[in-house]
Amino acid sequence: MALPVLVVDDSALARKILINALPADWDIEVQQASNGTDALKFYHEGKASVMFLDLTMPDMDGYQVLAQLKREDLNVFVIVVSADIQPGALERVKQLGAIAFVKKPASTEKLVPILKEYGLYE
């Protein structure tokens, strides 16, 4: 059964680059969201066991999404993928429950070790 994966970024190009960086042989069903509100909607519909999340988005940013997921005690593996590397960002996303922080652009080489570490990809 395909693993539901959600790619969240306000940039369609960034979503495309990230999707292309996912392992080609990974059995997944990918959904896309362009903002945090839609990301939470997809999650509540059961379409996100793994979420690749940008931090800087209109409407609801990645930090707000992480905070809401944590408040609701939701079970999802969140990998933050962002170009916004501000001091303290890594610590903040980890405190909010993200399993990893990947600097854009994402690549298969950056993602596979994280996915393997959490048993999401073999």
Which residues are covered by each model-predicted region?
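C-terminal output helix
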Residues: A106-K116
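Active-site beta3 strand of CheY-like receiver
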Residues: G46-F52
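Receiver (REC) domain active-site loop signature in two-component systems and cognate sites
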Residues: M57
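Acidic catalytic/metal-coordinating carboxylates
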Residues: N35-D38, D61-Q64
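Two-component/phosphorelay signaling modules centered on CheY-like receiver
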Residues: A12-Q31
